[in-house]
Amino acid sequence: MPSNRSVRYEQDVVIIWQDTRFANMGYQIFFQFLNSDGSIDLEPNGRPVTLSTGANQSNPAAAVLSDDSIVLAWVDARDENPNIYLQHLDANGNRLWGDYGIPLTESIPIEQKNPRVSYKADQNQVYISWSNYESHSGNLRFYVYGQMIQNEQKQWGPDGIKISYYPEEEFLYHECSQNELKENYFTWQDANLIEFTQSIFTKKVDANGQTAQGWPESGLQVSTYPI
């Protein structure tokens, strides 16, 4: 589970991490702006991405936008089940999406994990991906979901869209975990529960949330050799 991130910010760096400085409140996520000369811009011990406390915050992911603002995603246990929350920070470190952040989805699945954030600068699009634990025909599985945010608005509905796709009769035989995200290219690890193999798949998705022209609906298997 990644506990820290660093992303480029102008000529400087944004450091994002989780720590337990308040042991009775669980892990919390903090950030700091680090200048090229080694100086810092914010409080000496960093600034929290949310004022929510008392439940673990983990697995931070972030991307810097063209206006030097930052979109972050993390796993937050404040609700009954671990779910992903979002925050938008301006170039001065101010919280733009409220002091407590906003939930990634309106629905509350059993679990969300593996958040990833990427920015497509030429279209001013923020892409987010994650693993969603849900019931399919009475069986619980992880599948990969995605969301695109543009002009502060979710473009793929309140709960995003399912990225990892299989024919109806095959859904039960696969489980997927989000791996990497680069702009609108989603990469995940697929576990075949019948063959007991694991493979890496990649899929390009257009701005409407549809599989990009020329790409298979189920994604492109990067290698035919199991991992």
Model segments located where?
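Extracellular, repeat-based ectodomains that mediate carbohydrate processing or recognition
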Residues: 1-227
